[in-house]
UniProtKB/Swiss-Prot annotation:
Residues annotated as binding Mn(2+) 1: D296, E454, E495
Enzyme Commission no: 3.4.11.9
Protein name per Swiss-Prot or TrEMBL: Probable Xaa-Pro aminopeptidase GLRG_02280
Reactions mediated catalytically: Release of any N-terminal amino acid, including proline, that is linked to proline, even from a dipeptide or tripeptide
Record-linked Gene3D superfamilies: Creatinase/methionine aminopeptidase superfamily (3.90.230.10), Creatinase/prolidase N-terminal domain (3.40.350.10)
Lineage per the UniProt record: Eukaryota, Fungi, Dikarya, Ascomycota, Pezizomycotina
Species of origin: Colletotrichum graminicola (strain M1.001 / M2 / FGSC 10212) (Maize anthracnose fungus)
Metal-binding found in the keyword field: yes
Length: 526
């Protein structure tokens, strides 16, 4: 159980104080995860009404196509099927070539499914029929997609509004384009409305994520139990994947990360093919899906069964970062501030270890701690592992890698400049920080949000030398001699999925051991 902190102001060290914005004084609650029975029907109609409330429109037609059947270019083979998440949110149907419509005025939700001919069953099997879909999904009607165009002709009359996520999803074909010339096509309102609806989970969604986290946590435990007998990163991945698959969770929410040694310093390392021998720790980041809902858990394991002095010191700092931040989770907490708190704890720890040096206030003002804690503290979890955040940002950060055309990961980069801007925006009396469109500002936590808390400290030689040791502003605060001892550790990250409850939080991933329990499991003493 993490320490409960009930103060608005927490003294971090002798040079500053952290202001945590909280709108309630209730104490957080952590409970042991128990997986309740999975609800029988997907609450599509409840989701539709949440979307309608966010659209704030009394009329119009929402149209969402599902993922079509696909083949690779010049091939008769195709990728593994992955349903479009916005479509799934409004339907619950996890098979190809479907669509869903929602009539705002009549509150009528219709799922459109493909008709499966007998010869298709021979080759590919069948998909749920109309009667089965009505049992599985809370929709008003289920019809075949062969009837969809006729439905659209009848409902898209001059002056009506069609809501779609993307312009290329407008269901206009042939001469229908001319007849729909007076239909208003809205491609800007639906996605923000759906994002806002998705950010606070329904009870069904919480149950799905709870189940995904429970399966993933037990798979993490299985890896820890077998660790001393494993020789390669690939074996860690295999043990984990096998447990998930046999537990009914074949799909992973993201590429499994099993980075040992130097690879532990790469945030999205996923080659998972190097030997473990001679290395100190492995950062193991993996979370399965359950009915399309994600989980996201990270543990850092000592490969020999015992942490080295350097690895233990770093692990303790990261554990402190996580424990203290989780203890603040409750409705009304400004997540923005938790990242700043984690950064302060990281700096304090690195100064104590001697990796950082100098006047603490000057080190903080420079933002040099971002060399070692270079990503956001966490993100929403839902139908995407890095789920939508609604009209407000959890951390108010641009996706810098994506903006520059690079590979996009599930963590947001935090530079010294970004950290400084966050600190300035969080100062008492400061106005709400500006956010990039279409977001409005900083996000306070609400009941039934699910967020990760995933602090980490990394020693990536290329990153530190390329951007910090080469810059006099930061180099003067880094002790290169001490730092050299820590490169061998690679990195440490600890991550859990946290549900915001009425008056606190519930850690959904406690089944994955960490800390002293992790050491006992690895060494067969649990």
């Amino acid at each position: 159980m993490e320490t409960v902190v009930d103060h608005h102001v927490i003294e971090v060290d002798e040079f500053d104080a952290l202001f945590i914005e909280v709108k309630t004084e209730a104490a957080p609650v952590e409970s042991v995860v128990s997986v309740a029975p999975i609800p029988a029907r997907f609450p599509a109609k409840l989701h539709a009404r949440k979307i309608a409330a966010e659209l704030n429109a009394s009329d119009g037609l929402v149209f969402l196509p599902g993922e079509p059947s696909r083949s690779y270019e010049d091939s008769d083979m195709g990728p593994a099927f992955r349903q479009r998440r916005y479509f799934y949110y409004l339907s619950g149907a996890n098979f190809a070539d479907c669509a869903v419509t929602y009539e705002l005025a009549s509150d009528r939700l219709i799922l459109w499914v493909p008709y499966v001919e007998p010869r298709q069953v021979l080759w590919f099997g069948s998909t749920p029929g109309i009667s089965e879909c009505l049992k599985q999904f809370d929709v008003d009607d289920v019809r075949y997609t062969t009837q969809l165009n006729k439905f659209l002709y009848r409902h898209l009359t001059p002056g009506s509004t069609l809501y779609v996520i993307h312009a290329d999803q407008v269901p206009l074909h042939g001469d229908f384009l001319q007849s729909a010339a007076e239909v208003r096509i809205d491609v800007t309102s639906l996605q923000p409305a759906m994002d806002q609806a998705r950010v606070v989970k329904t009870d069904y969604e919480v149950a799905m994520i709870r189940k995904a986290a429970a399966v993933s946590a037990l798979a993490h435990r299985r890896v820890a139990e077998k660790l001393l007998r494993l020789e390669n990163e690939s074996e860690i991945e295999a043990v984990y994947q096998a447990w998930c698959t046999t537990s009914g969770a074949r799909e992973q929410a993201y590429a499994i990360i099993a980075g040992s040694g130097k690879n532990a310093s790469t945030l999205h390392y996923d080659a998972n093919n190097e030997p473990l021998e001679g290395r100190e720790v492995v950062v193991f980041d993996a979370g399965c899906e359950w009915h399309c809902y994600a989980s996201d858990i990270t543990r850092t394991l000592p490969i020999s069964g015992k942490f080295s002095a350097e690895a233990k010191a770093v692990y303790d700092v990261v554990a402190k970062m996580q424990d203290e931040c989780i203890s603040f989770i409750r409705p009304g907490t400004l997540f923005f501030d938790l990242h700043i708190h984690a950064s302060r704890v990281a700096q304090q720890g690195l100064l104590k270890l001697g990796v950082l040096k100098g006047d603490p206030a000057e080190v903080w003002d420079a933002g040099t701690v971002a060399a070692f804690f270079p990503h956001g503290l966490g993100h929403h979890v839902g139908l995407e592992v890095h789920d939508v955040s609604g009209r407000e940002r959890l951390l108010l950060l641009n996706n810098v890698m994506g903006a520059q055309g690079g590979r996009v990961g599930k963590r947001e980069v935090v530079t010294p400049e970004m950290l400084g801007a966050m600190v300035q925006a969080s100062a008492p009396g400061a106005a709400a920080a500006a956010a990039p469109p279409p977001y409005k500002g900083r996000q306070y936590l609400r009941k039934n949000m699910i967020v990760t808390v995933e602090p980490g400290i990394y020693f990536c030689r290329e990153y530190i030398e390329g951007y910090f040791l080469s810059n006099p502003r930061h180099a003067r605060f880094i002790n290169k001699t001490v730092l050299e001892r820590y490169y061998r550790v690679g990195g440490v990250r600890i991550e859990d999925d946290i549900l915001v409850t009425d008056d606190g939080y519930e850690n959904l991933s406690t089944g994955a051991p960490k800390g002293e329990e992790l050491l006992r499991v690895i060494n067969g003493k649990a």
